[in-house]
Amino acid sequence: MVRIGRMASPAASPEFWLSRRDLMAALGAAALCPAWPATVSAQGRTAVALQARIDRIALRPDGPETPVWSLGNGDLRFRRGEVLDVTFGNELPVAAALDCRGLDGNPAAEPLASRAQLAAGAKDTFQLRLRHAGTFLCEPLLGDGSTAPVHPRPLIVTGTSPVAVDRDEVLLIEEWRLRPDGTAIPPGNDPKESTPFHTINGKTSYEVSAPANARLRLRFINGSQRSVLAVKLENLDVRVMAIDGQPAEPFPARNGALVLAPGSRTDVFVDAAGPAGTSFPILLHDGKQARPVGRLIVSNEPPIRPAPFPPAPPLPGNDMPAQLDLRGAARFELALGTPTEWFRPADFKPSAAPAFQAKAGRPVVLTLTNRGAIASVLRLHGHHFRLLDRLDDGWKPFWLDTLAVEPGQTQRIAFLAEYPGRYLIEQIATDWAAPRLVRWYSVQ
């Protein structure tokens, strides 16, 4: 039985207790050997070749490798302001589109709304403009019911100003539903006769090592397709620096825990404080139980400095709107938890009526009501949004592109319609067998 309440004291237990409702409540409140893609750079433009392909990864030490559909391994790293000339090839047996989550203002590259799914064996070329620095995520966008799960690939865009950290580490958390034969059930299918399995960067136990007093930037990504997850770094001061790729006013993570909706990202700073050999467990909670998935270890190297850095200032900004004047905002309602007027990706047609149309330069307020029986996750393409307070008299001090909404709950979000074009809206229920559903909106 999972206890509903606060996390257990680190001194009392190596575990922390959360229910599924705890995860959702916390989310609402807070809301490496690199393998590089083929790239050629010239005058701020970079040619990038990405292939959606069948791959295999070893999830169990003594078990068979698991087939996955991926864009390759390792982080994709570029600089803010670059324009990527992307060649996307589909080597999968089904149609696919490239979905890069969190990249605002790229309407010509928008999957489904602007670019149809690519047939097996075909190629497509388009541009991606990297307007913002931050942590993003790329994956093939498929219809549910595929024969293998998707293995996403982190996209890291660095800023033009240096950030005072000694290590910059990506931690991609993935959830698998493994059959006894080692194959994995993709989301959108009944996970019967399977075992939930979690990895960080493809490993069941992931270690990060750093000298004493080193400052680390840890970029946590929830690569699970359906589950809200909590990650806890025990006995560490965890400072949240960015959410969903956008800098936030730094704040301490409550009890050292982060709650991540499917596809969401949170960047934190931690200091490797303590003598050599000190170990800080990394725990993962899926709403049912907590399990250790890694640790941060203070290495035997000499301390990198006599004492840890003082608290960090905010990360350099991405020129997001300083204010949103909601008095003249366009207001729309969007129902979640129901398939009405939503489409599976394979059934989506750009000729379908948009969920809403907004005028460029005008603020937009969306009222989201979850009419389903379980939590539903909304992903807004093209623009980041603010989560509004209950009375629309303010907003949370961070930007989001992904939001989980509890059953029966209503949330309001607001954004400035900056980038003309057509963009997707996604919703997924937090159930492995639930389909991904999409609609679109336009900015004119």
Model-predicted segments: where are they?
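Extended terminal and domain-junction accessory segments
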Residues: 36, 41-53, 147-178, 248-375, ...
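N-terminal edge beta-strand
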Residues: 61-77, 196-207, 339-360
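Short tyrosine-centred short linear motifs in exposed loops/low-complexity segments
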Residues: 81-82, 122, 130-136, 213-214, ...
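Asparagine-centered strand-capping/turn motif at beta-strand->loop junctions
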Residues: 88-92, 221-222, 368-372
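Histidine- and aromatic-rich segments of cupredoxin/plastocyanin-like copper-binding domains
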Residues: 107-120, 129, 173-175, 180, ...
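Hydrophobic or amphipathic alpha-helical targeting/insertion segments
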Residues: 130-158
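Active/binding-pocket-proximal capping segment
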Residues: 235-247, 371-398, 430-434, 440-444
